[in-house]
């Protein structure tokens, strides 16, 4: 994200009204706006692959898959973000125009310029959403998926997935081979070397508050 200098403080509603007049997308944090940068072709292809796989599944569950053009507002006063993909099954989001507020699952496809923010500050904001049950991080330079899930003790637990494994989204009872997410995605040989599935399974001990 790129901060916009000399931009006056805006409320969330002022941001909604201002952004529709702009030529690109902006995220809104603490009264300030940040221009969104474009993603790579692998980044876009991964998001499209996942969306295509999810859509038939969620349709029968009265849920919706939303693309990176849909904003997620953390509260009535912000912040507001554009995740790469979000899913809402909440009737309160049915009539949403500017942003949804009750997603159960959020996906970010990682890029070098935003990975640390997606893992840190942005995830901290997303955790404020009472409806959120899973936060998915997908690498765009190697076959790797990490899913943070809210457990029954209200702690966020990390489950990583590597090549050859089946990715599971428990909040919507969906699963698919991880390779489906990377279909027609060009990964360079040096970046696509993977840990074995057994090593990935052994690593599933991490948790985050």
Model-derived features: where do they sit?
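Gly/Pro/Ser/Thr-rich low-complexity, intrinsically disordered segments predominantly at protein N-termini
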Residues: 1-209
């Amino acid at each position: 994200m790129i901060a916009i200098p000399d931009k006056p403080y805006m409320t969330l509603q002022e941001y909604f009204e201002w952004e529709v007049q702009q030529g690109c997308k902006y995220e809104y944090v603490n009264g300030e706006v940040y221009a969104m940068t474009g993603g790579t072709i692998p980044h876009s292809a991964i998001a499209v692959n996942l969306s295509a796989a999810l859509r038939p599944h969620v349709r029968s569950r009265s849920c919706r898959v939303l693309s990176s053009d849909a904003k997620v507002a953390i509260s009535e006063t912000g912040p507001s973000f554009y995740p790469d993909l979000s899913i809402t099954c909440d009737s309160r989001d049915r009539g949403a125009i500017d942003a949804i507020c009750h997603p159960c699952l959020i996906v970010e496809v990682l890029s070098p310029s935003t990975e640390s923010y997606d893992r840190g500050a942005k995830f901290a904001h997303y955790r404020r959403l009472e409806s959120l049950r899973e936060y998915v991080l997908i690498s765009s330079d190697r076959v790797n998926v990490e899913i943070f899930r809210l457990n029954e003790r209200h702690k966020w637990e990390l489950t990583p997935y590597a090549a050859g494994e089946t990715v599971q989204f428990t909040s919507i009872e969906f699963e698919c081979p991880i390779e489906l997410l990377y279909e027609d995605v060009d990964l360079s040989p040096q970046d696509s070397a993977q840990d074995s599935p057994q090593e990935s399974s052994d690593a599933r001990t991490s948790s985050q508050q």
